[in-house]
Curated annotation (Swiss-Prot):
Transmembrane segments: none annotated. GO terms for cellular component: nucleus. This is Transcription factor Sox-14. It comes from Danio rerio (Zebrafish). Residues 8-76 bind DNA. It is found in: Nucleus. Coiled coil: none annotated. GO terms for molecular function: DNA-binding transcription activator activity, RNA polymerase II-specific; RNA polymerase II cis-regulatory region sequence-specific DNA binding. Acts as a negative regulator of transcription. May function as a switch in neuronal development. The gene is sox14.
C-alpha cells in the first residue's frame, strides 16, 4: 500500500532524536530482539538519563521543529488511525430494544405526544400486556394442580432440601409457614404486594400449637368450638 504523496511527517521530539542512533546500535547487538522490546528498553534508558545528558537532544528537537514550521507553515497533525476509545465505541454499539410500531402516535401533534408520554401510568398503556407488574402472580393463570404444588412447596423445603436455608434465617419452613423460632425473624406474605414477604417479630410457636389443617363444614346453628376436629374432618370427607 503506497503512502499518500501529501503526507507530512511530524517533527521528531528529543527522545526520537536520541533513540534514532541507539535503536540502530541495539538492533545490531541483538538481531533477534523484537522492535517492541527495543522500544521498551530505550524508553527505560531515556528515563535514567540526567537533564544535562538530555539537553543536547532537546535543543536539536527544538531546531528541527522550527525548521519544520518554516517548511510547512500550514501543517496540522492529522492521525492516520482513530484513537482506541473511538474504535471501541464503533465496535461495541449497545442495541436498543424494539418497542413496537408507533404509527398510532404519528397523527398526534407534538404537544399531545409529550403529554401522553409524560406520565408513567399513561405511558404504560402503550407497553405490551406482559410488562404489567405482578402479571406472573395472577392466580387465574395457574391450574388447581399448580396451586396445590405451590402450597406443598414450603413443607418440601422444610425437610432440609436446601442446606443454605438455615443461614438465611428460613428454618423449619422456608417461607415462615411452619416454624418461627425466637432467635430468627420469620416472614409472612405481604397483603398488598402478592409474591413478596415481610418480616415479622412475633413470638415463637410451640410444637403443640402446630396442628394439621382441618376442613370444617358448618351447618346452620352449629359452631366450630364444639366440634372434634378429627370427627369433623371425617364428616367433611364423607
Amino acid at each position: 500500500m503506497s503512502k499518500p504523496a501529501d503526507h507530512i511527517k511530524r517533527p521528531m521530539n528529543a527522545f526520537m532524536v536520541w533513540s534514532r542512533g541507539q535503536r540502530r546500535k541495539m538492533a545490531q547487538e541483538n538481531p533477534k530482539m523484537h522492535n517492541s522490546e527495543i522500544s521498551k528498553r530505550l524508553g527505560a534508558e531515556w528515563k535514567l538519563l540526567s537533564e544535562s545528558e538530555k539537553r543536547p537532544y532537546i535543543d536539536e528537537a527544538k531546531r528541527l521543529r522550527a525548521q519544520h514550521m518554516k517548511e510547512h507553515p500550514d501543517y496540522k497533525y492529522r492521525p492516520r488511525r482513530k484513537p482506541k476509545n473511538l474504535l471501541k465505541k464503533d465496535r461495541y454499539v449497545f442495541p436498543l430494544p424494539y418497542l413496537g410500531d408507533t404509527d398510532h402516535l404519528k397523527g398526534l401533534p407534538v404537544s399531545a405526544t409529550d403529554s401522553l408520554l409524560g406520565s408513567s401510568e399513561k405511558a404504560r398503556a402503550f407497553l405490551p400486556p406482559t410488562s404489567a407488574p405482578y402479571s406472573f402472580l395472577d392466580p387465574s393463570q395457574f391450574s388447581s394442580s399448580a396451586i396445590q404444588k405451590m402450597t406443598e412447596m414450603p413443607h418440601t423445603l422444610a425437610t432440609s432440601t436446601l442446606p443454605y436455608a438455615s443461614s438465611l434465617g428460613y428454618q423449619n419452613g422456608a417461607f415462615g409457614s411452619l416454624g418461627c423460632p425466637s432467635q430468627h425473624t420469620h416472614t409472612h406474605p405481604s397483603p398488598t404486594n402478592p409474591g413478596y414477604v415481610v418480616p415479622c417479630n412475633c413470638t415463637a410457636w410451640s410444637a403443640s400449637s402446630l396442628q394439621p389443617p382441618v376442613a370444617y363444614i358448618l351447618f346452620p346453628g352449629m359452631t366450630k368450638s364444639g366440634i372434634d376436629p378429627y370427627s369433623s374432618a371425617h364428616a367433611a370427607a364423607m
